[in-house]
Design a protein with these regions (language model features):
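Charged, glycine-rich intrinsically disordered N-terminal tails and low-complexity linkers that flank
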Residues: 1-62
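Phenylalanine-focused residue identity feature
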Residues: 28, 37, 53, 64, ...
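A short acidic/basic microdomain associated with nuclease active sites
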Residues: 60-96
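Mg2+/Mn2+-dependent nuclease catalytic core
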Residues: 82-84, 89-151
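Detector for Asparagine
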Residues: 3, 40, 45, 49, ...
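Short amphipathic alpha-helical segments, especially helix-boundary/capping motifs
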Residues: 1, 24-28, 79-82, 123-128
Length: 151
């Protein structure tokens, strides 16, 4: 069997927007120039720190209470590994020869034990209308695909 193909949600999005760019990246290791996402990284870290604070106390985040989310941040010994860009979570299919993986932002646990994979997104808008944004722009569809990949 040839080398296993590593896939991630970023790979899927890259393929959907530019198949040639994806092949250049995956097969020939030629990467397009990219912009730094320092603001998003900072927001992710702030959110992770807040979730960790409530995770240690086994309490819901105040926003969970405000928005009637029946959950607490999931307490698991591997949470830091799952959230790391270098390790993340992986599903390996030996039959299809691929490794699909990526880092998550957080996991929450509902009172019935069900887990919710959470992905934090930042916006500069004061009033964010998800339905309007989803219908008007393409980028939210990538977020939806991302969450579907976690299922």
């Amino acid at each position: 069997m040839s080398n296993i193909i590593k896939l991630s949600r970023t790979t899927v999005e890259k393929y959907l927007s530019c198949p040639r760019c994806c092949v250049l990246d995956k097969k020939f290791k030629i990467k397009p120039p990219s912009l730094p996402f320092t603001l998003n990284i900072a927001v992710d870290n702030l959110c992770k720190n807040e979730f960790d604070y409530y995770r240690k106390r086994n309490k819901p985040h105040p926003l969970f209470l405000k928005h009637d989310i029946d959950a607490v941040p999931f307490n698991h010994e591997e949470i830091d590994q799952w959230r790391s860009n270098f390790t993340g979570i992986h599903y390996i299919s030996k039959e299809k020869n691929y490794d699909f993986g990526g880092a998550i932002d957080d996991v929450w646990q509902k009172s019935n034990g069900e887990l919710i994979v959470a992905d934090v997104k930042a916006t500069s808008k004061n009033n964010f209308d998800w339905a309007e944004t989803f219908n008007k722009y393409e980028y939210p569809k990538a977020y939806k695909r991302q969450l579907e990949m976690y299922q």
